[in-house]
Design a protein with these regions (language model features):
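Positively charged n-region of N-terminal signal peptides that target proteins for export
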Residues: 1-4
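Bacterial N-terminal signal peptides
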Residues: 9-21
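C-terminal and inter-domain tail/linker signature
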Residues: 26-334
Length: 334
């Protein structure tokens, strides 16, 4: 009997020792919000130093980045890892999702000493980076813009604990933005009256809109000038602009993925592929006095995009978007 009790006691002690040895290690593999943000910052720092060994990658890590013609699947250490020359600057937005073990950022970096916008996503499995997604905007990024000096405060502020929404609500609201665009109806998404959208650093609705500047050598384009005139007359609200039908030239948005929901910051982050087949010639315009139609862009292209939505009290207040050109039909890689 004594021998049996002794064996039982030893077994219990061994079990406790095993739990002590492995329990904390298992827990340590799950990152909280700050841990995820730290991992992204470590990742960016390692990239600037061209040193992939400085961060932990899973053996089967998947890494994609947009090239000139396709969304490329690359070995870690290639792509922007080879060409980045500095950053990030003061313009840094982070969103982290402990439930999904995912983190995203939108930052200004330098590539060969020129400004670029980088939207990046990491997904961790057992504490190691298993997925990396880069979306890089090159050539049309002006880091001297006031809108790219630092993020809007709302994108950085915590939501008061009593007002925080759960992940499912943030994801649903973020996805509704794409429904509003393809449905040509701004009421499909819960936009705040003060909603302001920035695209590649330019204010596209809300605030003081900034029209893209034509290149000095560009030839006059009457249709483009007509579109710009019509855009200037559009309602300057997120809901109103969409409801006019000015985005009818978007053939589809597919896929659309809400990859990060940050309940502390009230941020939802989506990666998507805007598709434009160029078949629409004229877009009917609704609700704009003096304008009932406008020419549709006659271009076939895809526009891989990242959108960060700031959501408070169930409404979208800020949108920070990044997009880049790819040929029509390009696949997203995910």
């Amino acid at each position: 009997m004594k021998t049996k009790c002794l064996v039982t006691a030893v077994a219990v002690l061994v079990s406790i020792a095993i739990m002590g040895a492995f329990g904390p290690a298992v827990q340590a593999k799950q990152c909280d919000r700050q841990c995820l943000v730290n991992m992204m910052q470590r990742y960016l720092a390692a990239m600037v130093k061209h040193n992939p060994q400085a961060v932990p990658f899973a053996d089967n890590v998947k890494f994609t980045e947009n090239g000139e013609k396709i969304m490329e699947s690359l070995p870690v250490g290639k792509g922007l890892w080879e060409t980045v020359s500095g950053g990030p600057t003061a313009f840094q937005i982070y969103a982290a999702d402990p439930v999904a073990q995912a983190v995203a950022c939108l930052v200004i970096m330098k590539e060969k000493d020129k400004d670029i916008l980088l939207g990046a996503r990491l997904k961790l499995v057992d504490g190691k980076i298993a997925e990396v997604e880069h979306l890089v905007s090159r050539g049309n990024v002006d880091g001297s813009r006031p809108t790219l000096q630092k993020p809007r405060p709302g994108l950085l502020e915590d939501v008061p604990p009593a007002e925080r929404m759960d992940r499912g609500e943030l994801i649903k609201i973020g996805l509704s933005y794409y429904d509003a665009l393809t449905g040509e109806d701004g009421t499909y998404a819960p936009f705040a009256r003060e909603c302001e959208r920035h695209e590649n650093g330019a204010v596209s609705v809300g605030g003081t809109r900034q029209a893209p500047k034509p290149k000095p050598e560009a030839k006059p384009d009457p249709e483009a000038e007509l579109r710009m005139k019509a855009m200037a007359a559009m309602p300057n609200t997120c809901e109103g602009q969409i409801s006019t039908g000015t985005f009818a030239y978007i053939t589809d948005i597919s896929p659309r993925r809400l990859v990060v929901a940050d309940t502390q910051k009230g941020l939802a982050v989506g990666f998507s592929m805007f598709q434009h087949d160029g078949s629409l010639k004229v877009m009917p315009i609704k609700g704009v006095p003096g304008i009932d139609s406008m020419p549709a862009p006659q271009l076939r292209f895809n526009w891989p995009s990242m959108h960060i939505f700031k959501i408070r009290k169930g409404k979208i207040y800020e949108i920070e978007a990044l997009g880049a050109y790819l040929p029509y039909g390009a696949k997203p890689g995910w």
